[in-house]
């Protein structure tokens, strides 16, 4: 269990294939993937608070107030932890916060891996592909020259956060000498 989910888990599968093709056995692949389990970040913002309320993550009162104030939470996933990262007014501000958080991760937390070309960027969404493609363009402007893979969020994530969520993620990728 390398505690990855959705788009960062996709990169883990690609890493496992890279290691397999390089002649590593299952135990070696498992070891590498588990060693790198914390080398990823996901920032997600939601269209609605409805599913957080239904899942018991926020109270009905908080959901009602948040909806009236157009609050968009930015959630962060690192390893197995899902935490509130920020509360913003509107999706535009939420996207700015997510991009700034990702830039901070790249410049600080993952700086050494970025220098060595061991990081990759992902964009993800639930349902609204058109909005997701626009956000991918914003990510590309913030990270010029970096390939960005975009996929729908997994159903296991989507059922908790609802339609209209968008995310930016990064994960360390395996580089075999």
Q: What are the functions of these language-model segments?
A:
Residues 4-177:
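Mixed-charge interfacial surface used for oligomerization/domain docking
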